[in-house]
A protein has these predicted regions:
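Hydrophobic, well-ordered beta-alpha structural blocks that scaffold small-molecule cofactor pockets
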Residues: 1-60, 66-67, 78-79
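Catalytic nucleophile serine of serine hydrolases
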Residues: 24, 110-111, 133
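Short glycine-/acidic-enriched loop or helix-start segments at secondary-structure transitions
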Residues: 30, 53, 86-90, 94, ...
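SDR active-site strand-loop-helix element
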Residues: 44, 106-112
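Active-site loop signature of alpha/beta-hydrolase-fold enzymes
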Residues: 49, 112-115
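Active-site regions of enzymes building and remodeling cell-envelope glycoconjugates
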Residues: 51-62, 93, 120-125
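NAD(P)-cofactor binding segment of oxidoreductase domains
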Residues: 71-108
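Catalytic helix-loop patch of NAD(P)-dependent Rossmann-fold dehydrogenases
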Residues: 119-139
Length: 139
């Protein structure tokens, strides 16, 4: 499957350096695809002993990437969900550092849960948000 995705994907610029914040299920797959495309990528996990971890980001434990961890980053993808209180840990802890950088692209990987129960119907970004679950409402 990864090889098929690589064959169908557009490579990023040669000088691209991607930071994936949250290397769990989805973030881990994205990280592997970016690496397979030959692009430099750094992936955060809650622990360096986690598979695919290049740096640690665990805001609940006070483990925040340093400014030097962000050096050279051109693209950022966050998959980290908001806290139970609705705060985005990435914006809270890294927002000011990221704003100072010349980023080419910043993205947030959310959930289809923000569209609510669509009874199996396809949804897109053009559909109105209608989250039913508290977790989806925070996203």
């Amino acid at each position: 499957m990864l090889a098929d995705l690589v064959n169908r994907s557009q490579p990023l610029a040669r000088d691209a350096r991607v930071l994936v914040l949250g290397g769990g299920y989805s973030g881990g797959h994205v990280t592997r695809l970016i690496r397979a495309l030959g692009t430099t990528v750094r992936c955060s996990r809650r622990s360096l002993s986690s598979p695919g971890a290049d740096l640690v980001f665990d805001s609940t434990a006070g483990l925040i990437p340093t400014s030097s961890d962000l050096d050279g980053i051109t693209h950022v993808l966050s998959t980290i969900p908001p806290t139970a209180e609705g705060h985005d840990p990435v914006l809270t802890h890294l927002g000011s550092q990221l704003k100072k950088r010349s980023l080419t692209w910043v993205g947030y990987l959310s959930t289809t849960g923000v569209y609510g129960d669509q009874q199996g119907r396809w949804v897109s970004e053009d559909d109105p948000a209608n989250p039913g679950q508290p977790r989806s409402q925070r996203r």
